[in-house]
Amino acid sequence: MYLNVGGVPPRAAKVVPLVEVCGALTPSTMLPLGTKAPEFSLPDVVSGDTITLDTFKDKKALLMMFICRHCPFVQHVKNEIAKIGKDYQNKNVGVVAISANDAGSYSEDDPDSLKEMEDELDFTFPYCYDETQEVAKSYTAACTPDFFL
């Protein structure tokens, strides 16, 4: 996947931390600006399809949102998260949400509950479950919500 920033011809997918909104006790870290976007392969909780970085290869950019259902910060902005998907679906920008919480510790974040959240908010983008938290770790997403562009 390639990202075109500032009119520069695309070379390689780069991660740009867009916004860092985290709980006061959980510091968020960022990958260095310009880091190649880590590959991922995760199930969409709604369709069951496997979503990868390559899924968005024809998009101008990809917004990755690490969110979950139980987080009070996500609850506060969940309608705006849904609106982002609707606003950008026809602008050639890919959007994906990923939940990496342990469903054993947070039952509200199991795949069935995530699907209910997607249904409730009518997401227009895939909502994936990162059961092993490997994708979140590769992006250094330490809390929710964490946004990467």
Model-derived features with residue positions:
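Typically the conserved alpha-helix immediately C-terminal to a functionally engaged Cys/Sec
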Residues: F73-Y88, E108-P111
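Thiol-based oxidoreductase modules, predominantly thioredoxin-like and allied folds used
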Residues: N92-E108, F123-T132
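A short, hydrophobic beta-strand/beta-hairpin element that forms part of a small beta-sheet core
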Residues: F40, P145-L149
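Short, well-ordered coil/turn elements that cap or connect secondary structure elements
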Residues: D58, N90, E120-D122
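Compositionally biased, low-complexity intrinsically disordered regions
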Residues: P10-V16
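Short active-site neighborhood of thiol/selenol oxidoreductases, capturing the structured segment around
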Residues: L53-V77
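Short, internal strand/loop/helix patches
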Residues: K115-D146
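N-terminal "domain-start" segment that seeds a small globular fold
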Residues: L3, V16-D54
